């Protein structure tokens, strides 16, 4: 007979049920001139956002949004936007761990796929592939929590 040391508690599980591209766009407004050799590399700005919505008690839709814009001085060289999602089954985690799982672990699992899509679309647009550096989702989550706490404090102060 096996020993049952978990006292009826279930082991935490995190699994991807589906992954999908919700929105993808690439704009090359200066083509074909933008494809010519240039003296300096364009400035690239990347914005990242993560959202999660419950689908059921255990299933969540987690969406990673990546927005990249390359500029040469004030002219847009290219602009790409990707909204990449995953349906995750998250079960057995204590309630206090749910937000970190949804906003850190789930996007960490989605990121390599989203990064590859961005690299492919920029390459297919005539540019070198844009290889986005790894993202620190833990730091992003901590910043988001701090901003929400600061916002709650401001709203709690009577006028």
Swiss-Prot record:
It comes from Rhizobium etli (strain CIAT 652). NCBIfam families: PRK05751.1-3 (NF004392), secB (TIGR00809). GO terms for cellular component: cytoplasm. One of the proteins required for the normal export of preproteins out of the cell cytoplasm. It is a molecular chaperone that binds to a subset of precursor proteins, maintaining them in a translocation-competent state. It also specifically binds to its receptor SecA. Homotetramer, a dimer of dimers. One homotetramer interacts with 1 SecA dimer. HAMAP family: SecB. GO terms for molecular function: unfolded protein binding. The gene is secB. Its main location: cytoplasm. One of its GO terms (biological process) is protein transport. Belongs to the SecB family. This is Protein-export protein SecB. It holds the Pfam family SecB. InterPro entries: SecB (IPR003708), SecB-like_sf (IPR035958).
């Amino acid at each position: 007979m096996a020993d049952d040391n978990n006292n009826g508690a279930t082991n935490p599980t995190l699994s991807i049920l589906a992954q999908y591209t919700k929105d993808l766009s690439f704009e090359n407004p200066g083509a074909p001139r933008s494809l010519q050799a240039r003296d300096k590399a364009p400035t690239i700005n990347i914005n990242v956002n993560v959202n999660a919505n419950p689908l059921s008690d255990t299933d969540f839709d987690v969406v990673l949004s990546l927005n990249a814009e390359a500029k040469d001085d004030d002219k847009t060289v290219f602009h790409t936007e990707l909204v990449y999602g995953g349906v995750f089954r998250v079960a057995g985690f204590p309630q206090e761990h749910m937000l970190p799982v949804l906003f850190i672990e789930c996007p960490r699992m989605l990121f390599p796929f989203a990064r590859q899509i961005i690299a492919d679309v920029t390459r297919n647009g005539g540019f070198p592939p844009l290889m986005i550096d790894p993202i620190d989702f833990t730091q992003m989550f901590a910043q988001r929590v701090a901003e929400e706490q600061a916002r709650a404090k401001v709203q709690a102060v009577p006028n």
